[in-house]
């Protein structure tokens, strides 16, 4: 049994939706406030999920599959960069952690976008704080694993041909 291209794009979308639901649970139920890098990670997940959903609904053929998969892969690389930086910040010794900076909303309101992004990627103390872990991985660690999986899905889709109308064969 072989999954159609459409179903694989839906699978990628549902993984992104699950990731955002888990992020919402942590924020609104467990009261874990997201740091600026967490928010950027969510934006990347939302973008990848959007690409996968549009691809699944469009059900492209041949080159269209490759275009959507390439777009998803590029956004996945951005997500890997964001979460990789976040994991690195969390692995720093306490004396090397950058000082806490202003919140993302404050930076967006008061600084140009380029300066805001530079400050966010430089990182701050709040981004280095480990608030939760499971099986030895923090939230950014699990997010990095998910981005890697989404990247594999994108690469796999690039190598496939034919869409099919949602068939499992």
UniProtKB/Swiss-Prot annotation:
UniProt record, GO biological process: protein folding
One function term, GO molecular function aspect: protein-disulfide reductase activity
Membrane-spanning intervals of the chain: 9-25, 44-60, 68-84, 142-160
Location of this chain's protein in the cell: Cell inner membrane
Pfam family, one: DsbB
Annotated disulfide bonds: 35-38, 100-127
Record's keyword terms, sorted: Cell inner membrane, Cell membrane, Chaperone, Disulfide bond, Electron transport, Membrane, Oxidoreductase, Redox-active center, Transmembrane, Transmembrane helix, Transport
Periplasmic-facing ranges: 26-43, 85-141
Record topology, Cytoplasmic segments: 1-8, 61-67, 161-169
Entry GO terms, CC: plasma membrane
UniProt membrane topology term: Multi-pass membrane protein
Family in the record: Belongs to the DsbB family.
Protein role: Required for disulfide bond formation in some periplasmic proteins. Acts by oxidizing the DsbA protein.
Name recorded for this polypeptide: Disulfide bond formation protein B
Originating organism: Nitrosococcus oceani (strain ATCC 19707 / BCRC 17464 / JCM 30415 / NCIMB 11848 / C-107)
Lineage of origin: Bacteria, Pseudomonadati, Pseudomonadota, Gammaproteobacteria, Chromatiales
Gene name of the record: dsbB
């Amino acid at each position: 049994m072989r999954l159609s291209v459409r179903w694989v794009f839906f699978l990628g979308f549902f993984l992104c939706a699950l990731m955002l639901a888990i992020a919402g649970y942590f924020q609104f139920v467990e009261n874990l406030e997201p740091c600026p890098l967490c928010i950027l990670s969510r934006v990347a997940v939302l973008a990848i999920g959007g690409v996968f959903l549009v691809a699944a609904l469009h059900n492209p053929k041949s080159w269209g599959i490759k275009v959507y998969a390439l777009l998803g892969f590029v956004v996945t690389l951005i997500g890997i960069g964001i979460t990789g930086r976040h994991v690195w910040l969390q692995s720093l010794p306490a004396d090397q952690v950058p000082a806490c900076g202003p919140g993302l909303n404050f930076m967006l309101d008061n600084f140009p976008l380029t300066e805001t992004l530079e400050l966010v990627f430089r990182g701050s103390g709040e981004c280095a704080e480990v608030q939760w872990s499971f099986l030895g991985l923090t939230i950014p660690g699990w997010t990095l694993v998910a981005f890697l999986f989404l990247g594999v899905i994108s690469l796999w889709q690039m190598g496939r041909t034919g869409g099919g109308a949602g068939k499992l064969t």
